[in-house]
């Protein structure tokens, strides 16, 4: 064996050994949102499972602000040693870089680990809206262009883009009314001041079950575990390409060893099989999922392209 070959072999063995011994001290999980937000809760549920499996504390560190970019930037600037992870989500990574300059590069600054949740949205309107299903809803909007308004939690928010995509694919015209958060955006639909929106299942399910809103479908192509009796919009409106929502995942700073990412991904995939975790996610309005680092990387790229396409085609801009 040459000296070079011996060096490479020794390096590989050393890397594997480090991964097998990982973690040997507490791991910090940066959540770029305040406590109690959906990404925060999902990250905590997964962190508990990782802590049980790997016998080290996984400590949640909330770094909220600037639409998630402050915490995201703090995570990517941390040492790539596996001891700082990020509870990543669609807003800061898939959407924000298309709307404004961010201090991180979504294509270069992350080492993907695994998805942990898909966040379905629901098309909702006031119970008095003159339609009983998605096709009737679309037909009514087409017959009344620009008569109706749709709300969102803010210009450029997931709900805004997801509703704009629906409007485009369904070939309907309505006026956008942005709010500061999903709660007031839904309150004015409940009150009859706004026509409709497509907002997270977590935010809408209480209103739907309470009879204050009615729904015509959910946003992913497949039905969601949280409302299995409600068809997808793709199914109900005959829009097979309509397949979109938000996501939550775990990533690490770029440069984190592949072995560490694979180890964490494997533990997350095992955790996601637990029935208690699946039920917890359903109660949060999410679907528990997992994948490999390579699959996560491909998913993140696809989501960036999807949201970027919506922003460009609809000419969406936010005030800087």
Please name every model-derived segment.
Residues 91-101, 160, 165-169, 196-230:
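A ligand-binding cleft/hinge motif common to bilobed small-molecule-binding domains
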Residues 8-9, 233:
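N-terminal secretory/targeting leader peptides
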Residues 1-8:
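Bacterial N-terminal signal peptides that target proteins for export
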Residues 24-26, 172, 209, 258-320:
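An extracytoplasmic/periplasmic, membrane-proximal ligand-sensing/linker region
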Residues 14-17:
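N-terminal signal peptide c-region/cleavage motif recognized by signal peptidases
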Residues 77-84, 90, 98-184, 233-235, ...:
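Hinge/capping helix and adjacent helix->loop/strand transition within the periplasmic-binding protein
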Residues 19-109, 147, 155, 171-200, ...:
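N-terminal (or domain-start) structured segment
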């Amino acid at each position: 064996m040459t000296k070079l070959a011996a060096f490479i072999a020794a390096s590989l063995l050393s890397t594997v050994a480090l991964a097998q011994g990982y973690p040997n001290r507490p791991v910090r999980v940066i959540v770029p949102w305040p406590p109690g937000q959906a990404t925060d809760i999902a990250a905590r549920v997964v962190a508990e499972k990782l802590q049980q499996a790997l016998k080290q504390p996984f400590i949640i560190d909330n770094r909220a602000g600037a639409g998630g970019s402050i915490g995201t930037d703090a995570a990517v600037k941390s040492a790539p040693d596996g001891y700082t992870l990020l509870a990543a989500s669609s807003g800061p990574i898939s959407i924000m870089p298309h709307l404004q300059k961010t201090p991180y590069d979504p294509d270069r600054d992350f080492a993907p680990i695994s998805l942990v949740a898909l966040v379905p949205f629901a098309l909702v309107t006031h119970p008095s809206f003159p339609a009983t299903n998605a096709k009737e809803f679309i037909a009514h909007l087409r017959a009344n262009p620009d008569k109706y308004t749709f709300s969102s939690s803010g210009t450029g928010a997931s709900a805004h883009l997801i509703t704009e995509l629906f409007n485009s694919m369904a070939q309907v015209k309505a006026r956008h009314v942005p709010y500061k958060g999903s709660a007031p955006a839904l309150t004015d639909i409940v009150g009859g001041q706004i026509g409709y929106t497509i907002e997270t299942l977590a935010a809408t399910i209480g209103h739907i079950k309470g009879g204050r809103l009615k729904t015509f479908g959910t946003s992913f192509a497949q039905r969601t575990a949280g409302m299995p009796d409600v068809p997808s919009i793709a199914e109900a409106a005959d829009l097979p390409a309509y397949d979109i929502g938000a996501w939550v995942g775990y990533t690490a700073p770029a440069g984190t060893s592949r072995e560490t990412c694979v180890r964490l991904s494997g533990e997350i995939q095992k955790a996601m099989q637990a029935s208690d975790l699946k039920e917890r996610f359903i109660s949060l309005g999410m679907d528990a999922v997992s994948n490999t680092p390579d699959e996560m990387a491909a998913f993140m790229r696809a989501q960036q392209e999807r949201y970027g396409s919506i922003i460009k085609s609809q000419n969406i801009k936010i005030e800087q």
